[in-house]
Each structure stands twice: as C-alpha cells, then as structure tokens.
Amino acid sequence: MKHFYQDIQGWFDFQDLYKEMVKKHDNAKFVEVGAWKGKSTCFLAVEILNQKKKIKLDAIDSYEYLTDEFSYNKDAPDVFKKNIKPFKFIKPIFKNSLKAAKLYKNKSIDFIFFDSEHSEEYAMKEIKAWYPKVKIGGYMGGHDYVCFVHPDPKYVIGVGKAVNKIFDNNFKLYPGKTDKNGNLYGPSWLHKKRKESIIG
C-alpha cells in the first residue's frame, strides 16, 4: 500500500523508529498515544501492512486540548476516524492517556509511543502509568525529548527531564528532522524494558 501520511495535517518525523519497531515485531500489540488527525498512525499502519505483520494497533487521543489553541481544529476526531478507515486492525480510543492505561493488563503491550503533553510532571505520570503494561523485552518511546518549537520553556525540556530521571541512560535517541518550513523537530526516545529496568 502506498503511504499517504504526507497528505495528513500534523507533525511527524519518527518514521525510522516506527519502521524499526514493525520490523522487530509480529503477532504483537502496539499503542500510540497522541494521534490527532492520524498522520503518524497511518504511516505506522501502512508499514504494518507492507511488512505483512500481524500487529494490532490502538490509537489513543482524548482531544481535550481542542478547547485551547487548537480550537480551530475541532474536526480533528472526525478527520482521524476517516483517515484510519482503511485499516481494520486499528482501534481508536478517545480517552485521556492516564485513564486509558487502566484498560490494559500488565505486560500486554509490545510497543507504546507517546506524543502527548510535554510537561515533566505529566510525562512522569504517563510513563509510570503505562510502564507496567509493557512486556519484558517490549519497548516504550516518545516524541520531543526536546521540543524545540514550543514557546513555553517547561514544555521544551519536560519530556527529556522525565525520561532522564526514570531511565537514566537506559534509552536510545533518534535525531529530529527539519520540516519544509525550517522547523527542527526534537529527537525521539526509545527504551527497551528489561528485568533489571528501574520501574515496572
């Protein structure tokens, strides 16, 4: 199937990380937190199809933020549902991330990726809420280890501070990319859960 994520509004530069995760897994459960209009979700879904993998994908977004600076995009949930329609293996979940975590059994997820709120406090809560849900040998990652484009300093370094505190140096960084407008995206991070991991 030809990729069409380029035609969807949004921010997305972690293609390499997603390709790597699909390549590593089969008969697996993936979760994406922060879907917006489905740009990254649809890229991941096409990769799953093209690599002929049996992977179920849950896409989680509360769309609570549409009441503030994103209010002009109130159609985001409907656009998202339309964009994922070709993929029978995607399950949309319209819940807050911390509430959605309660829907999953411990050690049931092979890979989870966050692109949600970027404050240190929220990132800490989110990682701790979801970490028990990840299988031993599974992966947890997220976008914007540093969020260069955010005007509020607490969101620029919030995710990175949380990841450093929880995982120390036990994670890998994927460099961010520059978009066509010259905006540099922050790097993404990826941690592999092992028995000796700090939390879980």
Question: What are these language model-derived features?
Answer:
Residues 2-200:
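S-adenosylmethionine/decaboxylated-SAM
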